[in-house]
Swiss-Prot record:
Keyword Cytoplasm recorded: no
InterPro entries documented for this protein: Rotavirus_NSP6 (IPR006950)
Source organism phylogeny: Viruses, Riboviria, Orthornavirae, Duplornaviricota, Resentoviricetes
Protein name: Non-structural protein 6
Assembly behavior: Interacts with NSP2 and NSP5.
Organism: Rotavirus A (strain RVA/Human/United States/DS-1/1976/G2P1B[4]) (RV-A)
Keywords noted in UniProt: Host cytoplasm, Host mitochondrion
Coarse class of the protein's main subcellular location: host cell
Pfam family, one: Rota_NS6
Compartments reported by the entry: Host cytoplasm; Host mitochondrion
Cellular component, GO, one term: host cell mitochondrion
The family this protein is said to belong to: Belongs to the rotavirus A NSP6 family.
Length: 92
């Protein structure tokens, strides 16, 4: 599997994780959703680091993916204040 295929597989796994987390957490707050997304991302990055250090993601890439995931959730929740709280929670 070449680098492009591995990256595509990683992104597909991330999208599946985001999607399943959103559907499981509808009754909870957006911050809870993002905390669960953080766990998913941590596991994916740990897996990637253990199995292929060349493909490990840096902190900035992790933050960008968290932000995209939270914006994705916001688009389905339409809760502006919750999104602002989440952005503050994500920010270093």
């Amino acid at each position: 599997m070449n680098r492009l295929q591995q990256r595509q597989l990683f992104l597909e796994n991330l999208l599946v994780g985001v999607n399943s987390t959103f559907h499981q957490m509808q009754k909870l707050s957006i911050n809870t959703c993002c905390q669960n997304l953080q766990k998913i991302l941590d596991l994916l990055i740990l897996h990637r680091t253990i199995h292929s250090p060349a493909f490990r993601l840096d902190r900035m890439q992790l933050r960008q993916m968290q932000m995209l995931a939270c914006l994705w959730i916001h688009q389905r929740n339409h809760d502006h204040l919750a999104t602002l709280d989440t952005i503050k929670w994500i920010s270093p």
